[in-house]
Amino acid sequence: MKVTIYTDGAARGNPDGPGGYGTILSYIDSTGVEHIREYSGGYKKTTNNRMELMAAIVGLEALTKPCVVTLYSDSQYVVKAFNEHWLDGWIKKGWKRGKNEPVKNVDLWKRLLAAKNQHDVTFCWVKGHDGHPQNERCDVLATTAADGGNLADDNVVE
């Protein structure tokens, strides 16, 4: 099955404020009917990068069988990690980067890799806040979640 996932993350007062993620999952079933699902969640204290990662994780974890996925994100952090093979280098170096510095958000990178594992995923960058309807909707989902009253604890903020 072919699936399209759109994602966005947001943080207020990055890195010490609340944040949220928004995800849209879209697919067309065997009868030609399009199905769209939306996901969002908010955290009390987090970072924008963590919310960008969570948006991708939630979309991939929602899939119940192996799929061919096109995942759109306005986060170059997420897209370049895969398309420019940053992750391969980080893993080879024991989750270190550059000057032997630890990679941030390792907990979420590992979770994203596990969620991606059973799928054929293509990561595509889309310019944020540029009128792309699904990206704009994900932004609304993310910011609404960040501003909501039912925020979870993000136990690892780096």
From Swiss-Prot:
Chain segments annotated as transmembrane: none
Alphabetized Pfam families for the sequence: RNase_H (PF00075)
GO MF terms, alphabetically ordered: magnesium ion binding; nucleic acid binding; RNA-DNA hybrid ribonuclease activity
Any one biological process term the GO annotation gives: DNA replication, removal of RNA primer
Keyword Metal-binding set for record: yes
Domain RNase H type-1, residue spans: 1-147
Gene Ontology terms: cellular component: cytoplasm
Enzyme class: hydrolase
Key words, A-Z: Cytoplasm, Endonuclease, Hydrolase, Magnesium, Metal-binding, Nuclease
Protein's cellular compartments: Cytoplasm
Catalytic reaction annotation: Endonucleolytic cleavage to 5'-phosphomonoester
Binding site for Mg(2+) 1: D8, E52, D74
Essential cofactor(s): Mg(2+)
EC number: 3.1.26.4
Quaternary data: Monomer.
Family: Belongs to the RNase H family.
Biological role stated in the UniProt entry: Endonuclease that specifically degrades the RNA of RNA-DNA hybrids.
Name the record gives this protein: Ribonuclease H
Organism: Lachnoclostridium phytofermentans (strain ATCC 700394 / DSM 18823 / ISDg) (Clostridium phytofermentans)
Gene, per the UniProt record: rnhA
